[in-house]
Structure formats: C-alpha cells, structure tokens
C-alpha cells in the first residue's frame, strides 16, 4: 500500500452501513492505534468498542446529555439525538488516559491519542472500511464518559465510526500556502 496515496485519498464517510469490521479486522485496527508514536511508552489510549445493540449505551447517554442541557427537549429531538449513535455499525470511543505528573507532558500524551486515532482511520481504509472521527458535546461530558466505562479523569478524544461507505467520499484539496515558513 502506498501510504501517501492512502493519506491523500482518505476522507470522512458520513454514511456507513454493515458490515462492521470482524474480530480479526478490529484487532488490526486497534493494533495500528497502539503503534502510534508514544513518548514514554505510556499507552495513553483507551477504547470502548460498540457494535450492534451496545451502541444503545452511547445513544442513551447522548439522550441523557440532551435532557440535562435542554429539559424540555421534544421526543423528536431525543430520537434524532439517539440516532447519531446508530449511523455506523461500529463505533469506537477513544479516550486519553493521562498519567498526571509524569515527565512526559500531558499535551504529548493527548496528542499521542490523536495519532492513534489517525492510525485507526488509515488501518480501516486499508481494510476497505469507511470511517469518520467525530467529537461534539458527548465527547466532553462526564455522564457519557461514565456510561462508556472510562475512568473519571479520562478524556474522550473522539468517536471513530466504522462501516462500509455508501458513497465515495470527496478528498479535499489541501494547500500549504500560508501554513509553512521556511527558516
């Protein structure tokens, strides 16, 4: 596989369907994550894999969050919020488990988790799956974090949605104009 082409061709897939990665494919995706650069070898990533009915845990937690923030949310709003957790056959919540006070600064530990997620996206692509890295209010909510079984001081960095892409994504053109300074 040409890694540059894979990086340039990969795009987020908004519409994903069955099948989800099987056990062997999931293992490859998670192993790719664990191969991310990790100063201090702290393995600061934690994963919560949701497939099939277990996505309902996330759906319920998202609905609870909506109700806490909008006590008068309509039934339609709750259904719409829950449906966000059903947009892919598999969702992996990825959290940073930071070792506070370690010689490796916290920011480096969190960035390592971001690199792990990028590895997951590229591994999924190489296995023929579409993917999307999502965040939003649920990623920053203690109730969602608790519902997914993460430690109180873990921070969800993203939700990786995985499945078969219904329509080809549109890779973006990226320019370096104004972003690079040569010294």
Predicted regions and their residues:
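N-terminal amphipathic, basic helical "cap/leader" segment at the start of enzyme domains
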Residues: 1-87, 183
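Small-aliphatic-rich amphipathic alpha-helix that forms the alpha element of a beta-alpha
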Residues: 33, 92, 98, 102-146
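Short loop segments at secondary-structure junctions
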Residues: 52-54, 97-98, 164-167
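Short, electropositive alpha-helical surface patch
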Residues: 144-155
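Structural motif
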Residues: 89-91, 130, 155-157
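Ordered, amphipathic secondary-structure segments that act as subunit-interaction surfaces
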Residues: 79-101
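C-terminal helix-cap and adjacent tail motif
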Residues: 3-6, 12, 156-183
């Amino acid at each position: 596989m040409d890694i540059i082409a894979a990086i340039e061709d990969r795009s987020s897939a908004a519409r994903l369907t069955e099948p989800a990665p099987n056990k062997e494919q999931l293992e490859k995706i998670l192993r790719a994550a664990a191969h991310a650069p990790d100063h201090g070898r702290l393995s600061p990533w934690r994963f919560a894999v949701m497939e099939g009915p277990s996505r309902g845990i996330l759906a319920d937690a998202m609905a609870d969050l909506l109700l806490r923030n909008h006590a008068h949310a309509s039934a339609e709003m709750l259904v719409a919020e829950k449906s966000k957790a059903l947009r892919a056959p598999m969702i992996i919540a990825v959290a940073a488990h930071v070792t506070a006070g370690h010689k490796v600064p916290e920011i480096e530990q969190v960035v390592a988790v971001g690199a792990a997620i990028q590895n997951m996206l590229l591994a999924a692509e190489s296995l023929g799956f579409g993917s999307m890295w999502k965040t939003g209010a649920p990623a920053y909510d203690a109730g969602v974090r608790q519902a997914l079984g993460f430690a109180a001081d873990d921070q969800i960095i993203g939700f990786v949605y995985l499945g078969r892409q219904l329509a080809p994504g549109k890779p973006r053109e990226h320019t370096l104009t104004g972003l690079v300074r040569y010294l």
